């Protein structure tokens, strides 16, 4: 196998803080090279430098033997380098077809090539739909197709399966293997060890801006990889200090009630029909299903972002079906959205402002309180930051997710709806978030958790509701929650 790209001694700083410290990295043709690391380790920054999106402070890139001090995005594309970002970046008002073919040369019948790619992926994308209507999983597939249509020799996949269902993941893996046979080199950034072992012949682990482990995947067991990412052994539970810092700010809930926090009767809306459920204080209810089953649409309707077409919603025995989003929020219904960069965070605002954005205090107490709130969640969640005024866009994906979680908790929820809360989050941070959800529920907050990673529900959810084509196909109590049963119900079968 020939060397496609080599990075030598790459250094990079943001605001005087080193994020890459002398990185060396090599990718061969036909190789899947996995890149692991905790949140803020520098993985995405390194890949953005290779793709020409960021400029290194020092170091050199060699692409098929040609040296470059830096690359520009257009130059990287011409060299066959394509980055599929963790957060899809599509033109929302263009169609799927227009997004995929944007600025692609007209020769070689692109429409036919696109049809062939879709068939190879067994992908059911509606090419005439507006990109803004797609769920995150479908947006991810559009990004991947963009790269494939540009005959990428070097394909960088940043957490490509984070929001894909098992079936979509397996189809993607088949396409990756086909690309390997064509000599395409693939950098596969993931936190999912089974996927890395299934796909990657080589693995590199980054920590604090440096490569701390690299070699053939078979050389290392899971413990070695996790230890390299997180050098300090972490308990699965939160420490007493963290629990203290995570105590919710208000006193809205002190004890469980004998009536449900949320009651929904025959609710119909965009993407779902006749849904009924009850969630009680202190209960964690999982909402499983395939992408397109209507889970996110249901959550957004509960929050008031989408209109209802029928049915009723009660929050603590108060009907809220006609309430605005702001009124529902004031009553304690808080929603953590699926796409943190588009729907969740104010990326160009400071961390302190993002953290209290849902319950802004009066101006005279604002700044002092914001600093105290950021300090609380910095300690409790381990948010990696330099200072409260740091712009959210400069944080790693996992730390952005923690800021969004902090904002939701600071809003003093009665019902917390979390949509894909661990998307793009590393192994140790996932454990923190799971324990955080348990800690919140222990304070008698009702939690509705949506996840495409079905392995998250056993041991976490008190029960799991499964959706199929906009309807509930079944409910599993804690003792019956298993991957096989959830998958069977998600495909419309029996558990």
From Swiss-Prot:
Pfam families: ABC_tran. It catalyses: ATP + H2O + (2R,4S)-2-methyl-2,3,3,4-tetrahydroxytetrahydrofuran-[AI-2-binding protein]Side 1 = ADP + phosphate + (2R,4S)-2-methyl-2,3,3,4-tetrahydroxytetrahydrofuranSide 2 + [AI-2-binding protein]Side 1. It is an enzyme of class 7 (translocase). GO terms for cellular component: plasma membrane. The keyword Cell membrane applies. InterPro entries: AAA+_ATPase (IPR003593), ABC_carbohydrate_import_ATPase (IPR050107), ABC_transporter-like_ATP-bd (IPR003439), ABC_transporter-like_CS (IPR017871), P-loop_NTPase (IPR027417). GO terms for molecular function: ATP binding; ATP hydrolysis activity. Keywords: ATP-binding, Cell inner membrane, Cell membrane, Membrane, Nucleotide-binding, Repeat, Translocase, Transport. Residues 5-233, 256-494 form the ABC transporter domain. ATP binds at residues 37-44. It is a peripheral membrane protein. Its EC number is 7.6.2.13. Its main location: membrane. It is found in: Cell inner membrane. CDD domains: ABC_Carb_Monos_I, ABC_Carb_Monos_II. PANTHER family: AUTOINDUCER 2 IMPORT ATP-BINDING PROTEIN LSRA, CARBOHYDRATE TRANSPORT ATP-BINDING PROTEIN MG119-RELATED. Belongs to the ABC transporter superfamily. AI-2 autoinducer porter (TC 3.A.1.2.8) family. Part of the ABC transporter complex LsrABCD involved in autoinducer 2 (AI-2) import. Responsible for energy coupling to the transport system. This is Autoinducer 2 import ATP-binding protein LsrA. It comes from Enterobacter sp. (strain 638).
């Amino acid at each position: 196998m020939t060397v496609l790209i080599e990075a030598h001694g790459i250094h990079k700083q943001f605001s005087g803080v080193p994020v890459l410290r002398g990185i060396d990295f090599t990718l061969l043709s036909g190789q899947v090279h996995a890149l692991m690391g905790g949140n803020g380790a520098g993985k995405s920054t390194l890949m953005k430098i290779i793709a020409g999106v960021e400029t290194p402070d020092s170091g050199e890139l060699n692409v098929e033997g040609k040296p470059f001090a830096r690359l520009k995005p257009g130059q990287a594309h011409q060299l066959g380098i394509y980055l599929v970002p963790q957060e899809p970046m599509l033109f929302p008002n263009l169609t799927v077809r227009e997004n995929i073919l944007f600025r692609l040369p007209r020769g070689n019948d692109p429409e036919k090539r696109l049809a062939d790619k879709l068939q190879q992926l067994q992908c059911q994308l509606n090419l005439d739909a507006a990109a803004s209507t797609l769920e995150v999983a479908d947006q991810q597939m559009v990004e991947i197709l963009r790269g494939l249509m540009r005959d990428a020799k070097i394909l960088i996949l940043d957490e490509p399966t984070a929001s894909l269902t098992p079936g979509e993941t397996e189809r993607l893996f088949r396409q990756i293997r086909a690309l390997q046979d064509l000599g395409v080199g693939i950098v596969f950034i993931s936190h999912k060890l089974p996927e890395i072992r299934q796909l990657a012949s080589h693995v590199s682990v980054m920590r604090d801006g440096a490569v701390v482990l690299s070699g053939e995947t078979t050389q290392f067991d899971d413990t070695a990889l996790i230890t390299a990412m997180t050098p300090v052994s972490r308990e699965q539970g939160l420490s007493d200090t963290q629990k203290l810092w995570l105590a919710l700010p208000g006193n809205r809930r002190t004890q469980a009630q004998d009536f449900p926090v949320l009651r929904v009767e025959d609710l119909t809306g965009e993407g779902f029909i006749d849904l009924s459920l009850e969630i009680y204080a202190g209960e964690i209810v999982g909402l499983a299903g395939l992408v397109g089953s209507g889970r996110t649409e249901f959550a957004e309707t509960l929050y008031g972002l989408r209109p209802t077409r029928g049915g009723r919603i009660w929050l603590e025995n108060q009907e809220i079906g006609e309430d605005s989003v702001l009124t529902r929020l004031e009553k304690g219904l808080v929603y953590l959205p699926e796409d943190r960069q588009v729907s969740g965070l104010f990326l160009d605002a400071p961390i302190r402002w993002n953290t209290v954005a849902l319950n802004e205090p009066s101006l005279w107490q604002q700044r002092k309180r914001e600093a105290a709130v950021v300090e609380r969640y910095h300690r409790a969640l381990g948010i990696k930051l330099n200072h409260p005024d740091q712009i959210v866009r400069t944080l790693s994906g996992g730390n952005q997710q923690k800021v969004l979680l902090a904002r939701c908790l600071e809003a003093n929820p009665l019902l917390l709806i979390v949509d894909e809360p661990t998307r793009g989050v590393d192994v140790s941070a996932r454990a923190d978030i799971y324990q955080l959800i348990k800690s919140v529920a222990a304070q008698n907050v009702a939690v509705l958790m949506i996840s495409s990673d079905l392995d998250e529900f056993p041991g976490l959810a008190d029960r799991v509701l499964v959706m199929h084509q906009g309807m509930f196909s079944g409910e599993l109590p804690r003792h019956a929650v298993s991957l096989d049963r959830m998958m069977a119900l998600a495909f419309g079968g029996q558990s």
